[in-house]
Amino acid sequence: VLSGTGLPTSVFSRPRYLILLATLCCLLWGSAYPAIKGGYALLGIARSDTAAQLVFAGWRFLLAGALLLVMAQLTGRRVWALAPVQWAQLGLLGLAQTALQYVFFYVGLANTTGVKGSILNATGTFFSVLLAHFLYANDRLSRRKALGCAVGFAGVMVVNLRGGTQGLDAGFTLLGEGFIVIAAFVLSAASIYGKRLSQRIDPMVMTGWQLGIGGLVLLLGGLAGGGDIRGWSAGSLALLGYMAVLSAVAFTLWAALLKHNRVGQVTVFNFLIPVFGALLSALFLGEAVLEWRNLAALVMVCGGIWLVTTEAQAPRPVSSST
């Protein structure tokens, strides 16, 4: 039986492959940090130019969605033969998981510090665990899971306090810190909604449409807001292409992992993203990678993941059917 990614379903439900594939997804998403910074530098996009950032993100996700849909079509998947209700569901998923989430995130990031933005964005894992607790009987919140999330979140804080507490204060504004938290919640809720849709729609097709629809909305919204990107070069196009590919691969694998595993066991790996982002950014910027903060954060995040993923599985009920 195939999972919708071309890989056997059993691959995604085995613990060792869950760890490997979820870590790969987070490594790819973490690599987007230096790639985005590099793209902004090559295209002259200012940190405060939210409209241009939305245009850049729109192209990234639109291309990622197109790549997935072409691949799905070539491998014989049902790309167009969907019921009207499924089109509506995919539209809602694309608007929420890609478009709405990124609008909140980019606007929020423009109105707060990078340190606070990264830390608050990590609250998405808590939202996912809490939502799963109320939606799935086999994914209840436990002391071990809560401890694992707390340890992982502490690791995210450690990797972000590179300059001491600079950029970290008690200030809170709706357009800044508030929007970052809203973005994290929207992404968590949309991911769980996507988990439900993936039971009836091929994960590759689902991811392709949600990225494509969301990317188109971001692109049009950015252009309507005055976003203007000029001076495309071979380097900036290569970076855009890389980000489109990483998005296509990571989001498809993530959707398949969520389909075949409990939410908490997958989303706890999200704590790795800012750690990988910091490590890869330091590597490409020529900074010291083997800082104690980076190593301590990696150990803490891995410890949190271990606590959650090694939690005793609830026994499956024996089917009464013959």
Question: How should these model regions be labeled?
Answer:
Residues A52-A64, L109-T125, T173-F185, S233-S247, ...:
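Structural signature of hydrophobic alpha-helical transmembrane segments
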Residues L2-G58, L95, D169-R196, L220, ...:
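Glycine-/small-residue-enriched transmembrane alpha-helix faces in small-molecule transporters
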Residues A32, Q73-N121, V158, M243-N261:
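Specific transmembrane alpha-helical segments of multi-pass solute transporters/efflux pumps
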